[in-house]
Amino acid sequence: MEVKLAKTAGFCMGVRRAVDIVLDIAQHETSRIYTYGPLIHNPQTIELLKSRGIRPIENIEEIKDKNNAILIIRAHGIAPDERKKIKSSGLKVVDATCPKVGYVQSIIKKHTGLDYSVIIVGDREHPEVDGLLGYTGGRGIIISTLEEVDKIPYNEKVCVVAQTTQNLDDYNKIVEKIKEKCSQAVVFNTICSSTEQRQAEVTAMASEMDAMFIVGGKNSANTRRLADLAQKKQSSTFHIETPADMEKIDFGPYNRIGVSAGASTPNWIIDRVMDKIMDGQSRKLKNIGTLLNLWIYAIKTDIYSAIGAGCLCLVCMLLQNIPVSLTFIAIASLFVYAMHVLHRLLGRKPANLVGSFREESYQRYGKLYYYTAGLSIVFALALAFNKALPVFLFLFFLFLAGLIYNTITFPEQWNFKSFKDLPGSKNISMSVAWGIVTAILPALDKDYSFNAGLTVAFVFSFGIVFIRSAMSDILEIQSDKLIGQETIPVFFGRKRTITILKIISLILLAVLLVSSPLGWTSSLSFLLTICILYLWICFRFCDNKPVLSGAVKEGLLETSYILAGFCVLLWRIF
């Protein structure tokens, strides 16, 4: 059984650039933001941009207050006459045209000036082609099929270009026929290199797989071409826009499934499709499939996080040479479960747009999650009260802080709407909370005081949770950018964040190696270096395009907590 994700799936350079331009403007400008037509051909991304106040228009007359507006030229580009009209209106204009489309425009402009007629091979109704046609000065012809070549008039001076997302094989065939009719034709291969690579990979993959899933907007020309190419090699090809389109598909007959996506398809949709396929495939397995499904269920419901918190609490107690208390392990597990669930319920992303792999479960059983979270926090507080008053007060105020973080909003004139909008606040607050319930609370019992061992335990818990949280956000950086969530990867960028995390991991490694010889902690600290080595392996998820489902990726990151618990077992044995 195999599920393979194409390396070229998802946003191309031009789409990513256009989206980044828009989001950067949205972050720093107070003016109303408009795009001249849909920025890219993906309905889900367009809806997300609308939720941030970025509205597509078809005519500049739709903008009432032109002095307080910014108009962004879509990635597909526009005709020069339209550009002049926009500039003469006095609007502030930002050009997000794909540089590769701009290159084709420059070719047409140059050869039109040299008295050439221009043949554009592409889709007649596509906005890119419409924009290119505007550069021909009325001397352009659009060719969509091989048969249409017969209708073009003979001309010695002909320049041939392609829509950047054209099918390469079809373009070559059309060019050959044009040359038979116009032997002096000047031909440019203006198909984007990423388009060629994407098409080549899909063709090769479709020949090897039992089924192909092509993910992307039904209005996306390049996605439709990918589906057509896959269909030629593999009859079981499905062009889907969202995971909802997969509800009636039977995965039973397919053991090897390939997945690719159009140039306008965001990563979160690809991830959800991968989740759906992995769920379908795992049901076909027997014993291993049952265990895998149980593991994924625990991840989706945050039970796995709760178990991880219990493991970290056990580790922190033993690091500090504190007698193991099942009560504190239960407090940590219950509190982390409750706060994670409440955080997801109170601060959910737009469900129909960027639903995480947990979203379906939270939508279906929302009330049940509220009840279980409420009971968990009540039990955690009761156990804490039974232990000691300082433990109860610490936990109670930590619970209040969590509620304030998720519910309190700032005045409208402030730059940030809530605590959640502060850059990196989610990563830091989560790590501090875990550090308190796993390391500090057990130390408050009886006569234990703050010391070097407690500091090491807190630093270890904080550090490992912070690294896992930030790594998870690196994988979600695209959707977080779109909805305006200021995580550390969004604020610092992917590469800088990975560098920061590697530095933190090295500091953790050094602390663990010296803490026992210096008498600060037990010798367990040596074995815990395994967790740091495991996180370094996980860095590969961020450095390369992951081919696993979102739930599996999240589960592998959270396994760093469980691994810490296994280190205790090894320590006890040896």
Stretch-by-stretch model annotation:
Residues 340-374, 463-507:
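Solvent-exposed interhelical
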Residues 296-319, 372-374, 431-438:
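The first (N-terminal) embedded transmembrane alpha-helix
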Residues 1-261, 267-268, 274, 278-280:
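The feature marks the mature, well-folded catalytic cores of soluble enzymes
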